[in-house]
């Protein structure tokens, strides 16, 4: 079965009672102010069709979803060994901002989607691009077809003011020789990436290349190779949802990436990209109602990579 607007609207109605059972991220004040009632889903097919329900045209802070986009840019700019000698490909099983494992493993982060790994990717981008922030924004605008996408300066400033732990992570990696640039500019770029404001429709369009062997459905251009696409989807399936990746694979069965803004992107290779948004999070930092919506959609349309 193919997804329809009626199916999407029905799913949102079914998951709405979960609102009130999760917790909106409050360690970033600007995120804590977002209404917990927001609920959205959008599907972008490989034929270029958009199907949506709920608040799918309302922009929100994508947070860690941007880590998959930053990694995509790094994969374009670097040889594989240049990336993977500095960051691993394994699930961490730890909280996304944990430092214990990083110390034990000599400053090499487990994967590119926990904070430490994403900060290494930001460091890689800083080394190769004169204006990483501008390049990422340009990249996202092209992939989504939405020239109005911006960084939320309030969120970025808020994250910079509460950056002690991420700065500690960066300096710890530098002490092990796994950092090339000044920490503060790299963190600033990292926080701006997290502060991208996008809608579910924007996100579904932006990530269409992961459902289409590396070719953007929106621009018809190859972003990464089919092999790189397979590799990135594998990392999303194993590491994309913090320490809830196994649970997500079990329930939803799609490569995905979540953010503490309440968004999740999910990929059905060869067919479609799905974005959901509900700001309340579960204990792992993943959208509570969003995960349930993806599980229901996976069941209704009979799609899973497993």
Curated annotation (Swiss-Prot):
Keyword entries, A-Z: Hydrolase
GO molecular function: glutaminase activity
Top-rank taxon: Bacteria
EC number: 3.5.1.2
Residues binding substrate: 64, 115, 159, 166, 190, 242, 260
Annotated GO biological process: glutamate biosynthetic process; glutamine catabolic process
Enzyme category, top tier: hydrolase
Record field: catalytic activity: L-glutamine + H2O = L-glutamate + NH4(+)
InterPro entries found in the cross-reference section: Beta-lactam/transpept-like, Glutaminase
Subunit: Homotetramer.
Xref: HAMAP family: Glutaminase (MF_00313)
Family the entry assigns: Belongs to the glutaminase family.
Protein name from the UniProt record: Glutaminase
Biological source species: Vibrio atlanticus (strain LGP32)
Designated gene of the protein: glsA
């Amino acid at each position: 079965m193919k997804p329809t607007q009626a199916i999407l609207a029905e799913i949102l109605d079914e998951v709405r009672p979960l609102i009130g059972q999760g917790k909106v991220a409050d360690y970033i004040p600007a995120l804590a102010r977002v209404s917990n009632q927001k609920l959205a889903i959008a599907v972008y097919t490989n034929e270029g069709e958009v199907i949506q329900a709920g608040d799918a045209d309302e922009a929100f802070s994508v947070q860690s979803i941007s880590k998959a986009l930053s990694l995509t840019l790094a994969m374009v700019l670097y040889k594989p060994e240049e990336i993977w000698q500095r960051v691993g490909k394994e699930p961490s099983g730890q909280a996304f901002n944990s430092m214990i494992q990083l110390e034990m493993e000599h400053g090499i982060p487990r994967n590119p989607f926990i904070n430490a790994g994403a900060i290494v990717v930001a460091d890689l981008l800083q080394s190769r691009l004169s204006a990483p922030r501008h390049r990422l924004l340009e990249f996202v605008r092209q992939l989504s077809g939405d020239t109005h996408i911006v960084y939320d300066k309030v969120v970025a400033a808020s994250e910079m003011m509460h950056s002690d732990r991420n700065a500690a992570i960066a300096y710890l990696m530098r002490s092990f020789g796994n950092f090339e640039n000044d920490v503060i500019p790299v963190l600033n770029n990292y926080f701006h990436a997290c502060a991208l404001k996008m809608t579910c429709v924007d996100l579904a369009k932006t990530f269409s290349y992961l459902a289409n062997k590396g070719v953007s459905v929106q621009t018809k251009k190859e972003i990464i190779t089919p092999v790189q696409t397979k590799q990135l989807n594998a990392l999303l399936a194993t590491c994309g949802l913090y320490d809830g990746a196994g649970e997500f694979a079990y329930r939803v069965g799609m490569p995905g990436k979540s953010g503490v803004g309440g968004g999740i992107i999910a990929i059905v290779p060869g067919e479609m990209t799905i974005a959901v948004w509900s700001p309340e999070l579960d204990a792992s930092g993943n959208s509570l109602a969003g995960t349930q919506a993806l599980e229901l959609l996976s069941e209704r349309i009979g799609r899973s990579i497993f």
